[in-house]
């Protein structure tokens, strides 16, 4: 029942929210937001287990699939679509599904989150299999669409995890691993796009970033698999080569082109003074890890 969920409780500190000045509202929100990172910190051991599972999927050429409804679904899609430009993944490696389909990203689709079968249809459409990891996201921890997706994922042998913002969440029963970040009452009662949404975003940031580090998408703290899809990213790519190798900007730009705009290969070429083909071979042998290739 909704009344049992901490995310649905009234916040004792904001009973007079409608009487506060704008500054008081903002200060109240900021005060509540400060508690979110601390709530996430309590779940780091569970998040670590999720990351290890995702890395295993990636190593077996499996995928990471997020499912959610409303804000939770949008956050999953947001994390997924940032992976190709940031980490050089294809658009299949990390995917996000929202109840009601992509049109629900910009406009609510009434009743979609209440239908378990819609998630099964979505996951069947991509040929979900035992190599994949499915992460169900629901602030309340009880969304039928997410439960349906997790049930189907388990039925095909995929790894499963859940992210919710209430303890003993219903969706936790249907996942191998559970991340339950208890964010408590919102300043605006039941508006889980606030603290709960912030907590979910922090957890998703952790999962995708740490998983990509785990499969060699990062060298030192540089995103060496960045895709140069616009001028800003072309410049960033050259700067990454400068930072990684200590070469001048001019040398970095030269090797960037010699390496056919492959930042990893350019770094290996500069540091080992080798040709493009040899750099690719070294990276292949090192499974994409620049440090091992060197």
Curated annotation (Swiss-Prot):
SUPFAM superfamilies: SIS domain. NCBIfam families: N-acetylmuramic acid 6-phosphate etherase, PRK05441.1, PRK12570.1. This is N-acetylmuramic acid 6-phosphate etherase. Pathway: Amino-sugar metabolism; N-acetylmuramate degradation. It is an enzyme of class 4 (lyase). A lyase-type mechanism (elimination/hydration) is suggested for the cleavage of the lactyl ether bond of MurNAc 6-phosphate, with the formation of an alpha,beta-unsaturated aldehyde intermediate with (E)-stereochemistry, followed by the syn addition of water to give product. The keyword Lyase applies. CDD domains: SIS_Etherase (cd05007). Its EC number is 4.2.1.126. InterPro entries: Etherase_MurQ, Glucokinase_regulatory_CS, MURQ/GCKR, SIS_dom, SIS_dom_sf. PANTHER family: GLUCOKINASE REGULATORY PROTEIN. Belongs to the GCKR-like family. MurNAc-6-P etherase subfamily. It catalyses: N-acetyl-D-muramate 6-phosphate + H2O = N-acetyl-D-glucosamine 6-phosphate + (R)-lactate. One of its GO terms (molecular function) is carbon-oxygen lyase activity. GO terms for biological process: amino sugar catabolic process; N-acetylmuramic acid catabolic process; peptidoglycan turnover. Homodimer. Keywords: Carbohydrate metabolism, Lyase. PROSITE patterns: GCKR, SIS. Specifically catalyzes the cleavage of the D-lactyl ether substituent of MurNAc 6-phosphate, producing GlcNAc 6-phosphate and D-lactate. The active site is at 82 (proton donor), 113. Residues 54-217 form the SIS domain. It comes from the Bacteria.
């Amino acid at each position: 029942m909704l009344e049992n969920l901490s995310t649905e409780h009234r916040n004792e500190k904001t009973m007079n929210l409608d009487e506060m000045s704008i500054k008081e509202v903002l200060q109240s929100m900021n005060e509540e937001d400060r508690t979110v990172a601390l709530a996430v910190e309590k779940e780091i051991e569970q998040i670590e287990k999720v990351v290890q599972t995702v890395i295993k999927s990636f190593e077996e050429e499996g995928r990471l699939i997020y499912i959610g409804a409303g804000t939770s679904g949008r956050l999953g899609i947001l994390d997924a679509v940032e992976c190709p430009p940031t980490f050089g993944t294809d658009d299949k490696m990390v995917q996000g599904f929202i109840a009601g389909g992509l049109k629900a990203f910009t406009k609510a689709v009434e009743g979609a989150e209440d239908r378990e079968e819609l998630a099964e249809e979505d996951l069947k459409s991509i040929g979900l299999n035992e190599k994949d990891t499915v992460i169900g996201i629901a602030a309340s921890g009880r969304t039928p669409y997410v439960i349906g997706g997790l049930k189907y994922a388990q039925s095909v042998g995929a790894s499963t995890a859940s992210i919710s913002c209430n303890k003993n969440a219903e969706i936790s029963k249907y996942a191998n691993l559970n991340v339950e970040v208890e964010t408590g009452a919102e300043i605006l009662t039941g508006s889980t796009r606030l603290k709960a949404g912030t907590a979910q975003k922090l957890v998703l940031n952790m999962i995708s970033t740490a998983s990509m580090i785990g499969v060699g998408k990062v060298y030192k703290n540089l995103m060496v698999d960045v895709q140069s899809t616009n001028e800003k990213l072309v410049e960033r790519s050259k700067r990454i080569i400068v930072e990684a190798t200590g070469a001048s900007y001019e040398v970095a730009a030269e090797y960037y082109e010699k390496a056919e705009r492959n930042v990893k290969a350019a770094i290996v070429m500069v540091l080992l003074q080798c040709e493009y083909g040899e750099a690719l071979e070294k990276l292949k042998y090192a499974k994409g890890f620049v440090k091992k290739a060197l």
